[in-house]
Amino acid sequence: MAHGGEAGPARLVVLVSGTGTNLQALLDASAEPAFGALVAAVGADRAGIEGLARAERAGIPTFTRRLADYPDRAGWDRALTDAVSSYRPDLVVSAGFMKLVGPAFLAAFGGRFINTHPALLPAFPGVHGVRDALDYGVKVTGCTVFMVDAGTDTGPVIAQAVVPVREDDDVAGLHERIKVAERALLVDTVRAMASGGWSVQGRKVKVGR
């Protein structure tokens, strides 16, 4: 399965649930033509969040699909899929999107839907990755960009960055340093995928030709 590398900037749809700091990193990067990608739209699962406000200030189209507005999760998943599809993305980026997508979304965007995680997967998956790494006593942790699949933080790894753990670290301090690394890693990974394309073979993701 190969994607990308065509002429013209890659089209991104970015999904958010909160403040949108990873989105802002992508918006800032996309202001440079050499980045090779543009944010075509920003979607959210709730209204009134800073992530949507960031997009609106940048003149980016936005949409909201709230789970509570649909009779079941499958209906929400189809609606989210249709909304994202309407912007013809080359790559879909979860930038702090806190909902698990379903079969319709993965069928449409499998192999081109990426997410970040604040640990070195497959170690410490789930919502408490930073705390779990600190509690375990590891000397290094970090962040991962990965392809989303039907599991929780189980998709193929695309890129990782290491963050040392300090003796005096607490969860909040360590998480802040991981977030800095995560933003840089996400921007670098999207840039590489947009410019060089990517392919997925089983659990192996190759970026560039």
Task: Tell where the protein language model's regions lie, with residue ranges.
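Conserved acidic residues
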Residues: 40, 90, 111
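Donor/substrate-binding cores of folate-linked one-carbon enzymes
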Residues: 29, 95-204, 208
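Short, surface-exposed acidic-centric catalytic microdomains
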Residues: 35-79
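N-terminal glycine-rich "phosphate-gripper" loop used for MgATP/nucleotide binding
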Residues: 44-45, 68-69, 73, 87-103
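N-terminal Rossmann-like dinucleotide-binding module
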Residues: 2-50, 54
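Short, well-structured alpha-helical segments in soluble
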Residues: 78-87
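Residue-level detector of anion-binding/catalytic polar loops
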Residues: 61, 90, 139
